[in-house]
Regions:
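Acidic, metal-coordinating helix/loop segments flanking the phosphotransfer/catalytic sites
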Residues: 63-81
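Conserved acidic segment of CheY-like receiver
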Residues: 27-49, 82
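Conserved phosphoryl-transfer motifs of two-component systems
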Residues: 81, 129-132, 138
Length: 163
C-alpha cells in the first residue's frame, strides 16, 4: 500500500517521513502485523486504517502468521513499528516481543495486543512499548499506533503502558 503525500507542498525527507510546510511533520510508517488469526489481523488493519492520526500515515502493512517470518522480516530492518498478537499460537506475541527486544539491535517500537486489561504486567515483562487489551477498541488501537508512529526516528522511549 503506497501512500500519497499529505499535501501538494509536501516534500519527502530521509527515513520515510514527509514534512509539509505549515502543517508540521507527517510520520509515514511501515507496520509489521503478527497474528496467526486472520480475523485479528483484519480487525487491527481496519481499526488503525490508513491514517490513525492527522500526523501519522501508514504507508504499508506486512502481515505475518508465523514467528520465523516475523524474525526474518524484522532482521531486514524495513519496519518502523511492530504490532504483535499476545494470544497468537504456537508462539505468542509477548514472548516474541521479548525475544526481538533482546536479540535485534535497535528493534522498532512494539505494540502488543494482550488478552485482557489485567495482562499489562505481561506486556511490561515482554519489554513492549505499548499494550492494547482485547477486545480491541479501534480508538485506543489507532491512538497507540499513532503514539508509537510519532516516536519513529527519535530516541523517545514510551515505556510499557496500557493504552
Amino acid at each position: 500500500m503506497t501512500a500519497s503525500p499529505a499535501s501538494p507542498s509536501a516534500s519527502s525527507t530521509p527515513g520515510g517521513h514527509a514534512s509539509s510546510t505549515g502543517d508540521g511533520v507527517v510520520h509515514r510508517i511501515s507496520v509489521l502485523l503478527y497474528s496467526n488469526d486472520v480475523a485479528t489481523r483484519d480487525a487491527v488493519r481496519v481499526a488503525v486504517g490508513r491514517r490513525p492520526a492527522r500526523d501519522v500515515e501508514v504507508r504499508s502493512w506486512r502481515e505475518c502468521a508465523t514467528a520465523p517470518a516475523v524474525i526474518e522480516a524484522v532482521e531486514s530492518g524495513a519496519f518502523d513499528l511492530l504490532v504483535l498478537d499476545g494470544e497468537a499460537a504456537p508462539v505468542g506475541g509477548l514472548g516474541l516481543c521479548r525475544q526481538l527486544k533482546n536479540e535485534i539491535f535497535e528493534c522498532p517500537p512494539v505494540l502488543v495486543l494482550t488478552g485482557r486489561p489485567q495482562d499489562g504486567w505481561l506486556a511490561a515483562w515482554s519489554q513492549a512499548d505499548l499494550a492494547v487489551p482485547q477486545p480491541l477498541d479501534p480508538i485506543s488501537l489507532a491512538g497507540a499506533v499513532a503514539d508509537l508512529g510519532r516516536t519513529v526516528g527519535s530516541s523517545a522511549a514510551v515505556g510499557a503502558r496500557v493504552h
